[in-house]
Amino acid sequence: MLFAMMLTLAVTAAGQDPKPTPQKLFESGKYQEAIDSVRERPDAPEDQVYLRALAHRKLNQNDEAKQAFGSLAGAPEGSAWRMIGNSGNALVDGNLDAAQEAANHAVEADGGSAQARYQLGLVESARNNQPQAAAAFAKAAELDPQMAYAHYEAGMAYYKAKRVDKMAVYFENFLKLASAAPERPAVLSIMKTVRGK
């Protein structure tokens, strides 16, 4: 009897989905839930604070985004996170020159940071420098292959730069990584149009 109860509990526990990560919440368009999940942790790592800032931007909550970017900007002098925060705040303010300078410094400080490359891509995209944006997002995706939105943004930038060969690769990766993303229908439509099917 005891064995049967333990087996039932084990099967029930195994069948339950673990609490989704802030990244998975973000990738499924649950931006407020992603924000709340990060806020629950006062010691949240910088990559999650950055994700929180991006989620605020998706919800057009620019003041809250600036708070999150501001906490990153409080990182030690010379760190990539400090520059990412500064770039994010400048981008929210529409100061593209300052955003570009800070993003470039973030990449110089830590060229292996997917988030630094992603931030650079956001700035290049805002400046309508699509080939440079595509290269930055593609590098972010290379550095962190699980970063779904790096694939999405690379695909969009390649699409705008009329490089549909590269666009398709990044969009396919995005669709695999973020199957519940709100951008999924638009990506599928673009892929269908480009492929003529």
PLM features: what roles do these ranges have?
Residues 23, 54, 88-89, 122, ...:
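Residue-level recognition of tetratricopeptide repeat
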Residues 32-33, 59-68, 92-105, 127-139, ...:
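Structural signature of tandem alpha-helical TPR/SEL1-like repeats
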Residues 40-43, 70-74, 104-108, 138-142, ...:
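Conserved structural position within tetratricopeptide repeats
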Residues 40-47, 77-78, 112, 146, ...:
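Short coil loop/turn residues that delineate tetratricopeptide repeat
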Residues 51, 85-86, 119, 153, ...:
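Canonical tetratricopeptide repeat
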